[in-house]
Every structure is written in C-alpha cells, then in structure tokens.
C-alpha cells in the first residue's frame, strides 16, 4: 500500500519528534506530499476569543481585559506553533519532500484534525498517542481515539514510550 498525501498533526512535545520522524520515513518511501498541522486549542467557553455581553453582570472593563489577554495568548500560541512547524517543514524539505504546514484555532483538536485532513485530501494521518487510560482518558478525552474513529482515511498511531519504573 502506498500513500501520496500524509497529514501529520504535531505539537511541541517529545512524542511529536517521534511522530515526525516516522511520518518522514513513510513519506520518503513513496515520495508523498506532507502536511504538518497544529491545532491551537481554545479549552472552554471562558477562554473563547469572542467578547461576552456586559449584561451578564460582569464589569465591561474587566471583560475587555480578559478578552484582550485571551486574544494575546492565542496569538502567542499560534506564533509558537507556526515556528516549530516551520522548523519541521525545513527538515522535511531537506529530505527532498514536498511539505507544507497549517495551524488552526479550534476548541476540538480531534474534529479539526479529521476535517483538515479530509479537506486536504490526505490518504494517511500519522499522529501520536499519549497513552491515557481509564479516568484520565474519560475526563481529558483522547484525540487519537477520536481521529481513529472519525477520520476519512487510514490512521497510523505512534504510542508514547513510557519510562520504566
């Protein structure tokens, strides 16, 4: 089986370095195009970048300050993500691969990954899994689990290596 368009969601973690290396190996086999991707996550309604109406009993100036702080945080995270994605892009380009990157702000990284991969026409998604189980997975969710069950293409999951006790 060969892959022509490999979609690779990354963050700035050690696991993402392994995911990138594995995706690069796969891409080199078939000279596949690569899309590197990051989703800057808006975690909750309290962190949205949308102003909240003053009639909720909140001081307008405080709400504006909170909104501005959130906007600056999101801009900073997007700039940081674009920086490390560009570094990954440069490394892939040195291997002779056709590579690009995209960064989106979204409250749901799993959905954003699936939607962006489908819109790009990916035939493979390579992503990492941190290995949460039980309550941690139920509480915090699992992006990789969501992607495996909702992606419109094949998914290759790289498991995080746990340190031995």
Where would I find each of the regions flagged by the language model?
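Glycine-rich, Arg-bearing micro-motifs that act as flexible, cationic patches
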Residues: 2, 12, 127-149, 160, ...
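Solvent-exposed polar/charged
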Residues: 25-28, 118-119, 149
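A short acidic, glycine-rich active-site loop
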Residues: 58-83
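Small/aliphatic-rich secondary-structure junction motif
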Residues: 2-67, 93-95, 100
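Short, hinge-like loop/turn segments at secondary-structure boundaries
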Residues: 51-55, 118-120, 143-144
């Amino acid at each position: 089986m060969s892959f022509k368009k490999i979609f690779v969601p990354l963050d700035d973690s050690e696991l993402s370095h392994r995911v990138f290396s594995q995706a690069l190996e796969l891409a080199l086999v078939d000279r596949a195009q690569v899309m590197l991707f990051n989703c800057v996550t808006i975690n909750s309604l309290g962190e949205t970048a949308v102003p909240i109406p003053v009639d909720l009993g909140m001081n307008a100036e405080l709400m504006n300050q909170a909104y501005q702080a959130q906007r600056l945080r999101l801009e900073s995270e997007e700039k940081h993500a674009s920086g490390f994605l560009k570094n990954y892009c440069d490394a892939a380009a040195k291997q002779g691969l056709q590579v690009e990157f995209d960064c989106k702000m979204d409250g749901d990284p799993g959905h954003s990954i699936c939607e962006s991969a489908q819109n790009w026409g990916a035939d493979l998604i390579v992503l990492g899994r941190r290995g949460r189980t039980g309550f941690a997975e139920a509480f915090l969710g699992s992006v990789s689990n969501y992607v495996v069950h909702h992606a419109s293409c094949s998914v290759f999951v790289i498991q995080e290596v746990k340190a031995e006790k």
